């Protein structure tokens, strides 16, 4: 008896063939389903991810929510160190207060709060340094071969680095494995401590199907953005870094996404029939 499994194999193919370039120093666009690279510019060049680091920070939390070791209603205590973290963006947590994991996630994803990242890191791993080790273990596990994390926030450290391609791998993994939590990345505002902040992802406010991920900026590496968009049944993921301004980041990233949807399409190449079981017929008497 032969049992076959029919597998539909997809491939992203160039439909029209127009050329595009970008002012970003490093960039990549991948198909969200197949992982195929649709565009690249220095995609494996080391860069400082800045707040795009927080994609991995949230991934660690999502993983623990998914396996049941955490719940959204669990609370984390704010340490003095986390409370004092006011460099860069902040959720404005208060020392010695207990904050729900769900609120901290929104503080990280929507408000890009460095303080919220430290609260999460310390409560999950004891110290931010130990949390960074967890981040690196996960990076290796999902195939990020040119990445090293030293903190949960993306604050500049010469040893906190990644590549556009590795960040695309990270983004694809998070989206595909944790759809029940990924929707938080599409939220456009969050209020905490009577301070309402808007999501820093500029493409969420454009009518182009973008539904999440993170911006990043450091003076040493410029402006970056990991963004994902849906058009019908297709998803693309764009990661750029090294733009000289927020305006160029927004325009450049949106151009790459629009181009990828216009110039590529997924087609079924063939059906692969895989033999699962073979049983020899019984001999006749």
Regions found by a protein language model. Give the residues of each.
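Bacterial N-terminal signal peptides
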Residues: 2-11
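Sterically constrained small-residue positions within well-ordered secondary structures
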Residues: 6, 18-20, 229
């Amino acid at each position: 008896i032969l049992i076959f499994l029919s597998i539909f194999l997809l491939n992203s193919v160039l439909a029209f063939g127009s050329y595009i370039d970008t002012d970003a120093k490093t960039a990549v666009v991948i198909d969200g389903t197949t992982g195929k690279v649709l565009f690249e510019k220095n995609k494996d060049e080391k860069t400082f991810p800045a707040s795009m680091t927080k994609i991995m920070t949230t991934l660690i939390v999502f993983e623990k929510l998914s396996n049941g070791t955490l719940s959204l209603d669990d609370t984390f205590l704010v340490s003095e160190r986390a409370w004092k973290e006011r460099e860069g963006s902040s959720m404005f947590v208060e020392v010695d207060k207990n904050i729900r994991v769900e609120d901290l996630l929104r503080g990280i994803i929507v408000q890009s709060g460095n303080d919220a990242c430290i609260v999460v890191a310390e409560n999950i791993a004891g110290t931010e340094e130990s949390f960074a080790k967890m981040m690196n273990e996960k990076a290796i596990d999902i195939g990020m071969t040119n990445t090293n994390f030293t903190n949960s926030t993306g604050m500049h450290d010469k040893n906190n680095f990644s590549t556009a391609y590795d960040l695309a791998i990270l983004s694809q993994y998070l989206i595909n494995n944790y759809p029940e939590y990924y929707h938080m990345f599409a939220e456009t505002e969050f209020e905490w401590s009577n301070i309402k902040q808007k999501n820093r992802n500029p493409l969420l406010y454009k009518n182009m199907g973008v539904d999440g991920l993170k911006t990043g900026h450091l003076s040493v590496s410029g402006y970056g953005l990991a963004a994902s968009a849906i058009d019908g049944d297709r998803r693309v993921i764009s990661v750029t870094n090294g733009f000289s301004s927020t305006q160029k980041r927004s325009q450049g990233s949106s151009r790459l996404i629009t181009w990828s949807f216009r110039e590529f399409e997924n087609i079924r190449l063939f059906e692969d029939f895989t033999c699962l079981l073979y049983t020899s017929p019984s001999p006749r008497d």
